């Protein structure tokens, strides 16, 4: 494979194509920023391609010091590459950093990488490591350490390692492919992909991609907190809370541009928003992790304004095809047809989002294809269930006891029941639900947004991947997804995505009622804490005024 060396100041040729597509309305601005910056184009240059100036930083100057108290669930920690909830990552962001980050404007920004470049066909990526970064044990951060982490991510033998599915273009037989990484020098390495992969850099922004020290053995990152960031954990109690404090013995590489707070306290108040509200009124918390339903407005009424992020986050009410009767496509499609997604959005999520179409690709994704939705036909749904000999069968829909998720599943079940199909609801406490979320026969799972449509399909529905809670396996789907992963042009990729989305509908993989707008409430003196579209709690950037 020929590697085309490109100066850091040169623009990748695909970036101009994306800019043209954005001007023509084929990509929105956030989609354009994701695509262009993922190829190594700096954010100011990407804005310049659209004839725009990069947004300026806010005028308020953060002050040093203070304690910030954040409402958030605290879950038992484990190897970052096996993290399956954002909250696990958020606790550790103070010392475990990332190679790159996904921003609210859709851009991908360098963190522990200083920059990167892709060759013209996106088969070779040159990664330039940020100079001057040290671990908090004094070791210098090098290209060898980046390579070590990428190799860890590729190891599919580790149960629950979702990163393995994201690294398929540099993997073979469940591990890093020989020759996939070339270490050029202490601060430079190259990735040699087996095929073009438009998502590989963007995948490194996802929360399981936290960068760990080579001495990390895969256990609890809180117990042995070696990292590059400016904070250290003081305590971590599952279901209760966690405390993080600035590390006085470590010089952070980004000194002066963050780490304003002295102390961050995460407070676990359970899943009932009324308890969060009471804690806020009692002066016990300063901001929420996320706020839903009527509580967005209720928090505002007590002086905690909300910020909003328009996202492709969702609730997947999925069937696990490894369990009867959900191994029957006619059963799955019948249950889909019994549900009006618009009504679920209104009743389950207070109409704070947009209607989805049961294929887990969002209109804000650049490759989204408008193929129509599953028809709402309760009578046909009942007839199909009877035709399968299940007229007297009682289905069971399981959800966590979280307010909005329970309300959504209540709405789904009520419509199935109204169609003349027997169904019962089971609501489980968080600690019980999370332990087995992958395996329930019929349940709902909260899914974060990913910037590209192919990302979530690779994570959730490719045959055999760690997070395939639907038990979905389809060779044609996998082959089309491989094809889509390598197509940079949004229009061309959309043609393939139309086929992929149609397979999702034909196979009745899930009931996906809506796309979520996300909200966070915080006291007015909390700076830089706007809701992030992928639920990141970036306390390195937060400050108090």
What positions do the PLM features span?
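N-terminal secretory signal peptides
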Residues: 1-31
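N-terminal lobe/hinge region of extracytoplasmic solute-binding protein
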Residues: 71-120, 151, 226
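Gly/Pro-rich hinge or "lid" segments in bacterial periplasmic/extracellular proteins
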Residues: 103-107, 196-265, 274, 378-379, ...
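Surface-exposed binding/hinge segments that line
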Residues: 163-214, 237
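Extracytoplasmic/peripheral linker and loop segments enriched in polar/acidic and small residues
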Residues: 182, 404, 424-433, 456-524, ...
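Ligand-site clamp/hinge motif
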Residues: 216-222, 250-298, 413, 422
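Structural transition elements
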Residues: 231, 352-387, 403-407
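Long beta-strand-rich cores associated with HINT superfamily self-processing modules
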Residues: 520-545
């Amino acid at each position: 494979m020929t590697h085309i060396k490109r100066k850091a100041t040169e623009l990748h040729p695909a970036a101009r194509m994306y800019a043209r597509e954005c001007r023509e309305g084929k990509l929105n601005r956030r989609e354009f920023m994701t695509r262009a910056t993922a190829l190594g184009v700096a954010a100011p240059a990407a804005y310049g391609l659209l004839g725009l100036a990069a947004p300026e930083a806010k005028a308020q100057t953060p002050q040093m010091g203070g304690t910030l108290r954040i409402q958030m669930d605290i879950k038992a920690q484990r190897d970052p590459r096996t993290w399956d909830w954002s909250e696990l990552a958020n606790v550790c962001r103070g010392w475990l950093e990332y190679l790159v980050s996904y921003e609210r404007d859709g851009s991908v920004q360098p963190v522990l990488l200083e920059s990167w470049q892709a060759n013209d066909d996106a088969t070779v990526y040159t990664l330039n490591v940020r100079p001057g970064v040290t671990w908090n044990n004094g070791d210098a951060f090098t290209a060898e350490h980046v390579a070590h982490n990428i190799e860890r991510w590729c190891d599919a033998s580790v149960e629950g390692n979702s990163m393995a599915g994201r690294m398929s273009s540099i993997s073979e037989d469940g591990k890093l492919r020989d020759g996939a990484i070339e270490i050029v020098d202490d601060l430079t390495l190259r990735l040699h992909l087996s095929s073009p992969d438009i998502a590989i850099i963007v995948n490194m922004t996802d929360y399981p991609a936290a960068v760990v020290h080579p001495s990390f053995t895969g256990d609890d990152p809180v117990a042995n907190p070696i990292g590059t960031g400016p904070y250290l954990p003081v305590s971590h109690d599952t279901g209760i809370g966690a405390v993080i404090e600035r590390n006085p013995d470590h010089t952070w590489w980004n000194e002066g541009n963050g780490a304003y707070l002295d102390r961050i306290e995460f407070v676990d108040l359970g899943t009932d928003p009324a308890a969060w509200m009471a804690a806020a009124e009692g002066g016990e918390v300063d901001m929420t992790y996320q706020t839903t339903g009527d509580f967005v407005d209720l928090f505002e009424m007590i002086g905690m304004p909300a910020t909003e992020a328009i996202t492709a986050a969702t609730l997947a009410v999925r069937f696990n095809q490894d369990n009867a009767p959900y191994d029957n496509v006619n059963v799955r499609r019948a249950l889909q047809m019994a549900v009006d997604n618009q009504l679920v959005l209104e009743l389950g999520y207070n109409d704070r989002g947009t209607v989805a179409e049961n294929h887990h690709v969002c209109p804000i994704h650049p490759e989204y294809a408008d193929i129509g939705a599953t028809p709402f036909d309760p009578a046909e749904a009942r007839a199909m269930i009877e035709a399968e000999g299940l007229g007297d069968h009682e289905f069971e829909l399981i959800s966590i006891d979280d307010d909005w998720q329970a309300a959504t599943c209540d709405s789904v079940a009520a419509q199935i029941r109204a169609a003349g199909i027997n169904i019962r609801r089971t609501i489980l406490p968080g600690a019980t639900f999370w332990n087995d979320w992958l395996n329930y026969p019929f349940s709902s799972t909260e899914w974060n947004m990913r910037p590209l449509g192919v990302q979530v399909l690779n994570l959730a529905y490719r045959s055999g991947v760690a997070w395939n809670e639907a038990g979905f396996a389809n060779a044609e789907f996998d082959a089309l997804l491989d094809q889509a992963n390598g197509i940079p042009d949004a229009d061309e990729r959309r043609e393939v995505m139309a086929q992929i989305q149609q397979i999702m509908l034909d196979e009745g993989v899930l009931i996906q009622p809506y796309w979520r707008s996300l909200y966070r409430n915080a006291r007015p003196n909390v700076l830089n804490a706007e809701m992030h579209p992928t639920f990141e709690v970036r306390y390195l950037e937060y400050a108090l005024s």
